[in-house]
Amino acid sequence: MAEVNVEKLAGDIGTTVDKLLQQFSQAGITKQAGESVTEAEKATLLDHLSKQHGGTGSDGPARMTLQRKSKSTLSVTGSTGKAKSVQVEVRKTRTYVKKSAMEQEQEELRLAAEEKLRLEEQQKAAQEAAELKAKQEAERKAKEDADRKAKEEAKRKADAERKAKQKQMTPEQSAKSEKDRIEAERLQKEAEEAALKKAEEEAKRQAEEARKLAEENSARWKKEEEERKKREETSDHHLTTSTYAREAEDVADARDEQGTRRAKKKKKAPAKDKFAASKGRNKGKLKAPTSLQHGFTKPTADVKNEVRISETITVAELASRMAVKGAEVVKTMMKMGDMVTINQVIDQEAAQLVAEEMGHKVIIVKENELEQKVLNDRHEDGKSEPRAPVVTVMGHVDHGKTSTLDYIRSAKVASGEAGGITQHIGAYHVDVNGNMITFLDTPGHAAFTSMRARGAQATDIVILVVAADDGVMPQTKEAVQHARAAGVPLIIAVNKMDKEGVDPDRVKNELAQLDVIPEEWGGDTQYVHISAKTGLGIDELLEAVLNQSELLELTAPTVGMAAGVVIESRLDKGRGPVASILVQSGTLNQGDIVLCGLEYGRIRAMRDENGKDIKSAGPSIPVEILGLSGIPAAGDEATVVKDERKAREVALYRQGKFRDVKLARQQKAKLENMFSHMTEGDVSEVNVVLKADVQGSIEAISDSLTKLSTDEVKVKIVGSGVGGITETDATLAAASNAIVVGFNVRADASARKVIESENLDLRYYSVIYSLIDEVKQAMSGMLAPEFKQEIIGLAQVRDVFKSPKIGAIAGCMVTEGVIKRSAPIRVLRDNVVIYEGELESLRRFKDDVADVRNGMECGIGVKNYNDVRVGDQIEVFETVEIQRTL
C-alpha cells in the first residue's frame, strides 16, 4: 500500500495543512508538511478527534444492548370450552453504558462530597445528642433534689406531729405507737426487697430467653441467607436486574421484617414491674433489648363448630361452615376412601361423616319446611266413609290378565294391545251388583318390573293370574314378592281352566313352595278357578274380591282436598302433558291446583277411563287430568293445595333437590368406576334416541336396553322422552351417531326431513320384544370378529431334493384333505411345530398346480426354510372368521 504524506491527507479529508499539523500536535504527534503518515498515526488522530466531539474514542462502544427471547406455548380455554394453544414470546433487554474517565472522576468527587457531608451530619447529630443528654441529666438531678427536699420536709412535719402527739399520749400509748411504726417500716422494706428481687429474676430470665432466641434466629437467618445465595447462584436472573439492586432489596426486606417483628414484640409492662424497676440502684436496667424477637406461638385448641348440613352440600361450602380450608376436607375424605374435588356435591350422609371425623357437631337440616307447610295446610276434616277396593291384576306374560279384565268389563281391550301384550298400566272401574271395584292392569313382561311395583303400592288387593297349563313363571314369583313387600293380600286366579288336561293342583303345589297356602290347606289365600274365554268362575272371583275388601274395612274421606297417586303420564299432541291419577282420598274437582311430584298446575279438564269429560272424582276413581306444567313420573304423589304460587315454589325446590341428588349420585358413580372408564377406548357404543307414548314405557325400555350392555358393547341412551319424534331428537341423533327408536309414536314432517338428509336409522316398534331383539342384533354386529384356524390338509415328507433356485424340495404324499398353494403351513416334526410360514412352490410332475388332493404325490418348497427332513409332516390351514352373537 502506498504511503500518504501530510499534504495528501489534508487534501483527502478537505482541510488545510496547517490545521492538520495543529490537530496532529494536539494528539501528541509531531509532523512536518512533507512527512508520511502511518495507519497507526491515522488511528490515533481519529481517536483524538472523536473524543473532542463528545465520542468515546476507539476503546469500545459507549453503549451495548443485550436482548434475549424465549418462546413457550400456553393452553387457554376459550368461550366454547375448548382448549387452544397460544404462542407466548417473552423479550428481555439489558443495556450497558460505558462511563468515560471524566464521568468517573466526577462520580468520585460526588461520592467524596457525600461522604464528607455524611460525616458532618453524624458529628452534628452526636453533638446534639450529647447536649440533649446533658440537659436531661440536669433536669433529672433537679427533679431528684426537689423530690429529696419534699421528702425531708414531709418527714420533718411528720416527726413534729408525732412528737406533739407523744406529748399528749400516755407512756403506754407512745410505746405502742412506736412499735407499730417500726413494724410498718419493716413490712414495707421486706415488700420492696421482695419486689426488687422478683424484678431482677424476671429480668435475668427474659435476658436469657432473648439470648437463646437471638442465637437461634441468628443461626436460622444465616442458614436462610446461605440457601438464598445458593439459589441465586443456580438461578437465571433477569438481565436488567443488577446484583447491587437485588442486594439492596434483600437488605430492605430484612429491615422491614425486623421492624415488623419488633413492633409485634413490644408489650406494655405490668404496673408493679415498672414500679420495681424505677427504684434503687437497678433503675432503668430491666428494659429488655427491643431488637430481639421470639418465634414461639401459643398453642390454641381446635375450634368445634356446630355445622348445619342440608340434604346436599358442596365440599367448599362444608369447609366454610366448619371454618377450615377446603384442602383439609378433601384430605380427610381421601383418608376415608372418597376421591372428591372442591366443587363436588356430596350427600348428607357423607358430609355428616366428614364433619364428625373432624370433630364438629352436626345438625341435620331439613330444607323442605315450605313443602311440609304447604302439604299440611289442607282441609281434610271430612268423615271417613267406605270406599271401593283398588285391585291390581298381575301375572306372567300371556297368562290372561287383560282377557280376564276384559270379560269383567265386557270390552275387548286385549285385541287392541300390540301383540296381545299390555304395554302400560290401564285403570278402570266397574260396577258389580251395586258395588264398585277399580282395576289396575299391569304388564307381565320382565321389563316392566318398576310398573308392577308401583301398581302393588297403590292397590288394596292383588289378583294373581296363573295359567293352569303353564304354572308358576318368573313374573309370577315377582308378583308374589311385590304383594308381600306392599303388605297386600293375594287372590289366586287359576286361568285357562277350559283347556283339556290342565292340572290346577300343580299350580297350588308350586305356589305353596312360595308360602302362598290355599284356604283349604289351612292358609289364608283364596284360589278361584276361572276361564277368561268362557267366563267360568268370574263371578266367584268378583265375590272373593268383595269379601276380601269387607275384611279390610277400606275407608277414605270423601269431602275435602283430594290426594292420589300418578298411575301413568304421557305427552299428548294438542293437549299437552296428560297424567292418569288414582284418587285415594277427598274429591278431585276441575280447577283444583295440583302439586304432582316435580310438576304443578291447575286442572283444566278431567276425563274418566272411557274418555268422557267429568267435573269431579271421589276416592278409588281413576281419572286423566290436563293442565300440569310437565310430565310427572309414574308413582309420584298428587296432592291438591290452596296456593298456586306456593305450589310452584315447592315444585321448583323439588326439581333443584332432584338435580342435586342426581348429580351427586352420578359423580359418585363416575369416581367408583374410574378404573373401568380407563379402558373405555376399546368399548363400542350403540347410541339410541328413544321416544315412547308413556313414561312407564320409557323407564322399562331404557332399563332393558341398558341391561344388554356387555364389556365390549354398551348401549347408551343419549336422549329419551314422551311424545312424538321431533326435529330436535333427529338433530341429537345425527350429532351423536345414534339410531332413532319410536315406541308407539311417529316422527313429524320436520324430523323426517332431517332423518332423510342425514341418512339416520329410524325404527318404529309397538312390541317390546322386537325392539330388544333388533338392538341386540345391532350390538352383535359391533362385536369384534373371532377367528378360528381350521386344518384343511396334511402331507407326509417321503424324500428331500435339492433345487439350485429354491433350495430344499420336499417330496410329499398328501394323507389328509387338500394342499393349497395360497394357504399358510406349519412344519411338524414328531408332532411338534418347528416352523410356521407359507409355501413357495407346489408342483406335480414338474408342473405348478394350485392344489393337490388326498392320495396324490407332490413337491413342496417351503419359503425361507431348508431344514425339511424325511418323516416331517406339512400341515396346511386357513383362518375362518366366526360371527359372534350376544
UniProtKB/Swiss-Prot annotation:
tr-type G domain sequence ranges: 386-555
PANTHER family: TR-TYPE G DOMAIN-CONTAINING PROTEIN, TRANSLATION INITIATION FACTOR IF-2-RELATED
Highest taxon listed in the record's lineage: Bacteria
Region (Disordered) location: 46-91, 121-297
Binding sites annotated in the UniProt record for GTP: 395-402, 441-445, 495-498
Organism: Pseudoalteromonas translucida (strain TAC 125)
Annotated region (G4), positions in chain: 495-498
Protein name: Translation initiation factor IF-2
Family stated for the protein in its record: Belongs to the TRAFAC class translation factor GTPase superfamily. Classic translation factor GTPase family. IF-2 subfamily.
Subcellular location: Cytoplasm
Record function comment: One of the essential components for the initiation of protein synthesis. Protects formylmethionyl-tRNA from spontaneous hydrolysis and promotes its binding to the 30S ribosomal subunits. Also involved in the hydrolysis of GTP during the formation of the 70S ribosomal complex.
